[in-house]
Amino acid sequence: MSPTRAGRLLYERACEVLRLLEETGRQVTAIGRHDREGIVLGLTNGFANVVGRDLVLHARRDLPTVELSVVEERSVVLVEALERHEVDVALAYEVHERPGLLRVPLLEEETLFVTAPDSASRRRAKPSDRGRGRRGSRPIKFAELVTHPLVMPGPRDGVRQQVLATAKRLALPLQVTLDVSSVSMMKNMVARGDAAAIMPYGNVIEDIRQGTIVGRRIADPPLKRTMYLVRPMSRAAFEEEGGILHLIERMCRQYVDTLGELATPLAALRDGALHAAATTAA
């Protein structure tokens, strides 16, 4: 089912009106804040763990006219917050096409199979392996992964949905023994050997570096997900549009560098085309 020409025209004009209203609201708010533009940026836990601090510090130093607020949530929650206009722009994973949202794919990232370390693996691992974590062990095949009891986040989580879909496609049974929506609780249970898990590297980066959790890449097939910059089409452009997008691009590049072989930049990030792609409908 596709909209008629009249319907498309009405939608486009409605977006124009909403942008004008949004821009007026921003200007009025900026006057009340002594010309500081308020922007709410949504990030996932893993991304915030890796570059969140640097992002906030760079924003404070390089964007003095911006009052940046950061919201940390799961991707599905961030998308819903965008649609309610509680968040202005977000970096979220596996965002499907939705009316009124502009999506720009930024990078592709592998998730890891994480377990508690045993004493033998600790003795075998070199200090450099423990520091990097993710390269210290051989990859695990998906068919082997499913033989382990798993702790997984709730049904709406993107990683869980991907794991279940892959297992179904390969006709492999899963041993999901625990449903836990808390990242810190999942990591605690993995570290204590209660179960294994499939998690983004950013969520367990410090645990792997400290040796309390071991991360292994997943093969046959690897589990990959795409990070998008997402913003409402009805939102007016930021007054510091160029500065905000440059900051996001810079932090995404830093994130890719930190993940190394686990992340691949896509065209908008790789070719420096984020500003053009992210302002297409703004």
Residue ranges and their predicted role:
Residues 2-33, 250-253:
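Alpha-helical "hinge/linker" immediately C-terminal to small N-terminal DNA-binding modules
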Residues 4-7, 41, 81-83, 145, ...:
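Hydrophobic residues within well-ordered alpha-helices
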Residues 6-13, 51, 55, 162-163, ...:
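Short amphipathic alpha-helical coupling segments at ligand-binding clamshell hinges
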Residues 36-99, 180:
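Central regulatory/effector-binding core of bacterial HTH transcription factors
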Residues 38-42, 90, 151, 197, ...:
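Short, well-ordered beta-strand segments
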Residues 62, 73-148, 203, 222-223:
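Acidic, Gly/Pro-rich loop/turn segments at junctions of secondary structure
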Residues 74-79, 83-87, 93, 156-214, ...:
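Hydrophobic hinge/microswitch elements
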Residues 130-137, 201-210, 220-282:
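C-terminal effector-binding regulatory domain of bacterial HTH transcription factors
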